[in-house]
Structures are given as C-alpha cells and as structure tokens.
UniProtKB/Swiss-Prot annotation:
Keyword terms, alphabetized: Chloroplast, Membrane, Photosynthesis, Photosystem I, Plastid, Thylakoid, Transmembrane, Transmembrane helix
Major localisation: plastid
Listed GO CC annotations: chloroplast thylakoid membrane; photosystem I
Localization: Plastid, Chloroplast thylakoid membrane
Name of the protein in its database record: Photosystem I reaction center subunit VIII
InterPro entries according to UniProt: PSI_PsaI, PSI_PsaI_sf
Bilayer topology term: Single-pass membrane protein
Family to which the UniProt record says this protein belongs: Belongs to the PsaI family.
Origin: domain of life: Eukaryota
Residue ranges crossing the lipid bilayer per the database entry: 7-29
Native source species: Psilotum nudum
Functional summary from the UniProt entry: May help in the organization of the PsaL subunit.
GO biological process: photosynthesis
Amino acid sequence: MTASYLPSIFVPLVGLVFPAITMASLFIYIEQDEIV
C-alpha cells in the first residue's frame, strides 16, 4: 500500500480549495462591511 498517489490528489485540492475559501471569506467580509 503506497501513498505515491496522494500528491496528485492534495496538490489540486489545496490549489483549488484554499483560494476558494479565501475568496469566499473575503466576499463575505466585504458584504458584511458594506451592510453595517
């Protein structure tokens, strides 16, 4: 049982999920800042 396939899963996952969370949190922060 080798873990050689893990980088091919984690690299796109980190490259897509982290920017998505960052953009979503920034969008929510800006929206809340405009409402208040």
